[in-house]
Amino acid sequence: MKEYQVYLERARSRQQDFLYPLIFREYIYGLAYSHNFNRSIFVENVGSDSKYSLLIVKRLITRMYQQNHLIISANDSNKNPFWGYNKNFYSQIISEGFAIVVEIPFFLEKSSSLEEAEIIKSYKNLRSIHSIFPFLEDKFTYLNYVSDIRIPYPIHLEILVQILRYWVKDAPFFHLLRLFLYNFSNWNSFITTKNSISTFSKSNPRLFLFLYNFYVCEYESIFLFLRNKSSHLRLKSFSVFFERIFFYAKREHLVEVFAKDFSYTLTFFKDPLIHYVRYQGKCILASKNSPFLMNKWKHYFIHLWQGFFYVWSQPRTIHINQLSEHSFQLLGYFLNVRVNRSVVRSQMLQNTFLIEIFSKKLDIIVPIIPLIRSLAKAKFCNVLGPLISKPVWADSSDFDIIDRFLXICRNLSHYYNGSSKKKSLYRIKYILRLSCIKTLACKHKSTVRAFLKRSGSEELLEEFFTEEEEILSLIFPRDSSTLHRLNRNRIWYLDILFSNDLVNDE
């Protein structure tokens, strides 16, 4: 962060807050290499035709200074000598430069907004993606309806650039960014297909994710404005939104649009209890009130995406379900609200009568079928469940093979320990345990039974089931009833920053 600040202040003193000159600075690409962002493009690859090194970056910067090579039209982009024969190579280099440069001011803005160390400490546990589940356990039992929404895509790259312009004021920088996108994303029509976006996101992951996150942030900022206008209660907690250029003008225009189109509905659309949760491209909207108000939110979202972001979205893609009757998927878990009925006998004077008590509880379940599909895709078993070995690991030592399987089992157990039903998790552990035994038997060219009898590895493989209990026993006494109760109840770990590779959240 300090390096960012030094380099940006040096450029500000010369160019008055413009980002465009930073594209031609070699230290920008040095930062990308030294900080080891997603994937480094500056290490030499012997198996490739191009040598990824800082020397090539320096030559690229020199050629970018030649303005006659940058005058490119959409029709002759493939013939321009600037890009040469290796288009993907230049795409990676320039994309990395754009991503680093455009992230600098927002890193500085975020760091300046969190000046006190206590503020950072207080939000430390909230970095975990599992910190959302205690919130859901506390709030969702009082709600009745839930809407499972997937943020629509693909969005045209021009819309992404226009959204970014509200944050950064630098016309030459965006001119060069458009030039880059025109030449590397086949930006020939306003209709953007999923295949073209997928190709661009794979070849330029950091830049694409940065632009996509701005799209989501813009959508959520408008949603936050609508939520505050439609609720009697003030919002107590919200994410930090950076100040943007022309935001207030856009907001006034948005008020005029909604006042004109929804003048009869906005006046009584008051939802005092509504909760919104998002992870990546999926969001969940839950409310206590009638489905009529949820339908209003549904149409607001559709009009917002189609009229403001020019993204096609159909009403049938947004489902509104009753929490007590339907489950929804979030972060690899299945969630639903279970209604428990209990009968209490009460007596008053000479009369006795029965009282029915209904209580709600949020069930968080491991999705066993999607997990088995993920294990089958990773070649641990087939889709029906029978075990197969991992022959690609047969060249490793026995200790390395066992350690690999234990690490996978440990990560899954760590991730899914918040489940209210642990039997499904034990089935996954059992599949991994037998797959490990079968891989070891395949390596030694023996049957599973003969291998276990000869090597006595059965006791060693018990770690698949006992490791989690040993960790809990370090915290609680072994002879206490607390340990047995924790094995059955949910335990959320607040150190999980991303979902497991085997988690299927489709």
From Swiss-Prot:
Location relative to the cell: Plastid, Chloroplast
Record's keyword terms, sorted: Chloroplast, mRNA processing, Plastid, RNA-binding, tRNA processing
Superkingdom assignment: Eukaryota
Chief location of this protein within or outside the cell: plastid
One of the Pfam families matching this protein, by short name: MatK_N
GO cellular component: chloroplast
Signal sequence interval, chain numbering: none
Gene Ontology biological process terms from the UniProt entry: mRNA processing; RNA splicing; tRNA processing
InterPro entries named in the record: Domain_X, Maturase_MatK, Maturase_MatK_N
Molecular function terms, GO-annotated: RNA binding
Keyword flag Cell membrane: no
UniProt entry tagged with the keyword rRNA processing: no
Family indicated by similarity: Belongs to the intron maturase 2 family. MatK subfamily.
Function per UniProt: Usually encoded in the trnK tRNA gene intron. Probably assists in splicing its own and other chloroplast group II introns.
Name of protein: Maturase K
UniProt organism field: Medicago sativa
